[in-house]
């Protein structure tokens, strides 16, 4: 025991000392970088010191024992015999450690290595010697060795962060963040989603998203890591091996479930009029029985069918159809009818006198003969087609049998030819011809003009020789089957499989299994015979009877479920015929040994082009009937309906004393109900009811002795319920009372239905459809829709609040009312008729305004006059050998310029300028009007276009017209005529000429802008794309205006237009008084008074002082102005160019979608959101955009104000004015463009109002055009201010947040949206070209995709250096015309409309190819910039 304990102690101490003491000593020696000789010296020194200690201690204690001397001598001899051990550092240290391993105290504080090999040999001398040596050596260790050699020091500690850094240097931990597709795919390759292209992709295993991301990051660290990714950018993986199973999973939990917690499922049952027969029948018969006879199964297709049996099954089906048609014998019946009509016509023609009645009969006969002949031909054609199909199928079967060398089916087809009696046929035809001749002779004798009748007779009685079908197929099962030994190996295996298959059927009654058939084998003709009768005794009402067909081979599987109908009460045992119910199974069975399988496509050998995919199908033959007892009585339960029970219950109840039962209150209703139900009068259950019905019939029209209110209800109704339901005004009143109608909040309800347009109800229905949540669209599109719906709801609630406190004046109701304030105004009105007329100085008269009630469809037209254009780009081609190389035009609107590239091309090659043939198209409401084609870069048309206009709902009131959201497009095109010579045509032949139009630019303005103003007139800058392939600027330049010489406008196109509505429509502005709110403060009241005074001075100028927020609270407009931070992403793009940063911020604001036009912009209420809500919802009106842009400019310390005015092309607008060092700049938030104050082409027409965070200023200058306005609002003679100067210093608390928090746009959703837009545009282009094929040039599309990202910020060259050579290669073979268009993302439909307006799809030149690329640049908060590059390519001839 002591020896074993000692060995255990040595092992523990050695393990502990090995980890601490040895490591410390080794680390010290390693740090001093001692070589092997120094280590040996240290070992010798230590060993000598130990020996000296031993000698001294032994001298003091006395002489050693013989045992100790033996041990020392043994140790000394072994040390001499092994000099290599002394040289080793580890062995010298272990020698020292071995001399102190037996101390008990050392095991508590140190860890040692195992004992030396020589030490155990000392223990073999005896147990007694060991015990003596133990105590002495332990004391020696404590006193001498431990105190001199071991040193006590603090433990070394290493920081956790340093350990982590060391681990990171050796261990790679992949990130769980998602990886973009560009890193996983080859360069310039877009992900390809096969599912979106219509391919079937099997379901892949579900993997945790973070795990998948880690795996992708780990693979990308490898050199060949991209080979692990597929075309879609996902890791390639096999489909999931887990298949969904319908097997029930047992509860395998060990602990038993509390029985009180178990759910007991019970089937819902009807009210107990006796679900059980036993409880209901009392003493009557209680046993009812159904007899189910299951005959067998017949498979119309089986997975063990070979191709011959597939054809035989088809032949059987065709033969059954042929037999059915032969039984119907429709063709023969029509032939006999035709013969009878011919005989009747013959008899009528033989009559000597033809009266009016006879002529009508003859005409009717002729029509019937014609129709009957057509029907006969149709039915005869069906019979012939069916016969041909039978013969063709039989021919395939014979060919297949001959090819495979054996016969698998006993089917045999024989065709018999039936001889017809030709005499009867010739006789019938001769009779028809004689009838026709006699009819014509009589008409000539009578001399009557029966041209129409003779025409019909001659046309319809011309009956050709009828050739009846003389072939009759007969199908038999007499063909001899090939013996098994003579068949192929595959056929032998297939027949062996047939013998192994067995089937059985389970019978379920009311979802409970009641019986099961015996297992029957499958025969070679694929029939399974059961022939078993099952007697089902009923205790509950029969609800459903289900038969489950099972297939049994190596395993049992469910093949199909069959639900058979319950028999009626006349179907008794022995009197029912067999019935058939079809079944099918979608079970997938792969073919193996010559069979075709099931649910697997295959090709017929007889017809290699016919591909079939058949499912396992067949039919079950059975009969279900009610059984008979010993006496021959049917065992059928008598049904008892709910109404009969109520009648029996209320048999003796007085009708007048029970007012709660409606059918007993009104005898007439009870009488009508009894007639509709058709109650059996012989049923004793209804005896009392039939007595009442008989009594009512005999009573007739006797007046009852009691009063019935329902009988007099019609007299109380002033109009019928049908007319009330059709009344439009009544429907509107109901909707307004329910608070669901917003259109008539600020106007009275029309009195007559004719004044109410149907558009009101259409808008209400469409509004309800839009409010339904959208689930099948992109999340960004869904955000746009939800934001618009949210703003509509907010506006609706605030409008209801305004209506409650608004009051209308007389002028708001009476349109013709004109208030005369004083007598002087009356005198002026009279003097107008007396003052002289000066012909040389005519006075301008205002156009007469027409009221909406006097306008009908066709009275209103939009007049658009196209005067002339300036600086239209011209076509430019370069001559390089025999090839024409097109160049491209760069617009000055975009920052993308390539003048150096163009100059280099021009210097190297010879250039010549082609002429341009421009024309203008005006488009409104999908109707296009075109001007004549002019010539040159500065054409003059001077043409007036009258655009037809029809208001939706035929309502021409201003409120209805203001709902029209359509735009008026004025597009400039270049007409090109191209001739194409066909290859097969001679040189002298003239080629085909094709006209194509190339889009050059457009001017767009909404219809609402034209409605608000009397006219739109002037010279406007045309919006042209940044790049126009194939075009360049003209060398000649004409200044559009005299005051535009100083500006550099050589790279701009201008168009002079005039547009108006004829006649002008009058409208009434509704300005509700908003000063009746209970929570009005002194400042808000002052603002309302200030607004009234300003409107009195200049009624046509805009002034806004107070608005409502999205919570319906009224605020001063100055509280919306506050410096707010723009997105940091925009600030990091142009770090050293502040002007470019301001332009980018203005562009960012213009990309936020605008709120659709309000139902009536003259409702006098303004609802503005804060800038934070405008950014978060990604939608806003014009004023909210201007406020947001102003707040961004204030963030940079610029002096900015919001300007309210009127634009020529946009109507009411809101601009931002910034004061620079020497000038004022006008920023348009809707387009992001900046204009100088004295820019003649600035679309701003009037400056009406300014406001910032301190005050509101109203423009009281007589001329309010931007070029004439003096913007120093400190001058009170020019600007009228709302707040006095003593109040301006104290800033009012803003309702804007301290800062706006932005979030990044999901790039995966942006990519998904880009793919959707690109697919939709391609399908639309093909849809717009129904008569021409549409070919897409992939190489050009690839190049355009590389160009688009560089156009967003206008950086880089037109084509990249990598794609330059590829683009030049395309230009060598194609004439390329195209352009990019840019727009903010609102919805997909707006992008489709913009592409359609360019007309690039209208190219009719054959073999025209197209290229289309879409790029979406994401900004924060789902604000997107959409670029669409369109190009058409025509191959050089």
From Swiss-Prot:
SUPFAM superfamilies: C2 domain (Calcium/lipid-binding domain, CaLB). It comes from the Eukaryota. One of its GO terms (cellular component) is ciliary transition zone. InterPro entries: C2_dom (IPR000008), C2_domain_sf (IPR035892), CC2D2AN-C2 (IPR028928), CEP76_C (IPR056288), CEPT76/DRC7_peptidase-like_dom (IPR056290), DUF5523 (IPR041510), Tectonic-like_complex_comp (IPR052434). It holds the Pfam family CC2D2AN-C2. One of its GO terms (biological process) is protein localization to ciliary transition zone. This is Protein CC2D2B. It comes from Homo sapiens. The lineage of its organism: Eukaryota, Metazoa, Chordata, Craniata, Vertebrata.
